[in-house]
UniProtKB/Swiss-Prot annotation:
Coiled coil: none annotated. SMART domains: WD40. WD repeats lie at residues 17-56, 61-100, 104-141, 144-183, 186-224, 227-265, 268-308. It comes from Dictyostelium discoideum (Social amoeba). Belongs to the WD repeat WDR55 family. Disulfide bonds: none annotated. Keywords: Repeat, WD repeat. The keyword Transmembrane helix does not apply. InterPro entries: WD40/YVTN_repeat-like_dom_sf, WD40_repeat_dom_sf, WD40_rpt, WDR55_POC1. This is WD repeat-containing protein 55 homolog.
Amino acid sequence: MDTSSEGDHELAPNDISFNTIPFSLNFHPTEDLLVVSDAEGRLKLFKYSLDENEVKLSLRPHQSGCRQANFSSDGKYIFTASSDCSMKVIDINTGSILYTREEAHDYPINCLVSKEFMVFTGDDEGTIKVWDMRQQNIVCEFQEHGDFISDITTIDDRHIAATSGDGGVSIYNFVRKSMDDISEKSDNELLSCLSLDNGQKLVCGSQDGSILIYDRNNLENVKKFAGHPQSVDALVKVNNNTFFSGSSDGIIRFIGLRPKKLLGVVGEHSTFPIERMAISRDNRYLGSISHDFSLKFWNVASFYEEDESEDADSANANANEIENDDDDDDDDDEIEDIENATKVDDDSGSEMGDDDDDDDDEEQEEEEESSSDEDIKRKKPQQNPIKAQQIEKQKQKQNQKRSFFKDL
């Protein structure tokens, strides 16, 4: 890919090409490694760098499409899920298949997400299963959706959210083995989801190109705004207020949540749909795979650096933006829609159209957000000593944790 002359800060590894459409992409949690799976059941482990991209492992664990390949939290294993309904665990050093669950689901598995020793899977008929990989057993399962599970995201240590082709999003407490909430069905398939605002907001991409923002504590409270000419298939978090979106129009956008603005265009895969995106362990490279049979790297370090420098002022900025929201509404019609954007100046952004313009709702939202921002300001200066002790104990416990596959 093209690189800038401004030094290594703007450089990125070269593109990687494939012989078939790649299905999933994930970066290693501690090393410069990434794994890609494809439509023919293969997976490849790459070591990436500015000099070259080296294949460290190549195998075909499934005879049908390998829809997901994801690293364990310690980076020692790769979990895979396939359209053949099976799930496998692979040692990244040897390529050995350590564990196979042939009938993990009754229908093809579409999603797989891991957190610590827990794995969450979703299939084509709407079933979600929670696995404890220390025991290689199912903890619980949920059947709340009537169509395929398109995406699963972790909210915190107890909760996950899932989107479905039936147009709904749901939240589960996998510790209590219960569903917390499920939304009404939207008119379009929901294809991707992301947890933002310290877990208080769920951002979901839809088939018609709009983005739905749900209140995590009340899924009936949803804001919808247009923004993409085609479906939003992939979302990656930058911070609690910004994210990257990948669309079927081939463009990767950088978007602000509050206020809703297009902050930049990262790049594009020509006009080929973007299948998946992921961020590297150091937040330097965004990886994207597409129907153009390629993996592209984008140097996005500056996006994260800018957002980190703005975090200290975010509460004040959000409060000011909320106070001025009514004035900004008058100018919305004059601002170009995000779908027409091809180039964006770094110091400017286009407002994204909001389909929810009810004044009473806006006033209520402003009061809630202002109250939330004030809470942030009050809580930020001090650190709870009891909480600090709990965190330290948790770290010690994690350091003592043995590998959950030691007996295999």
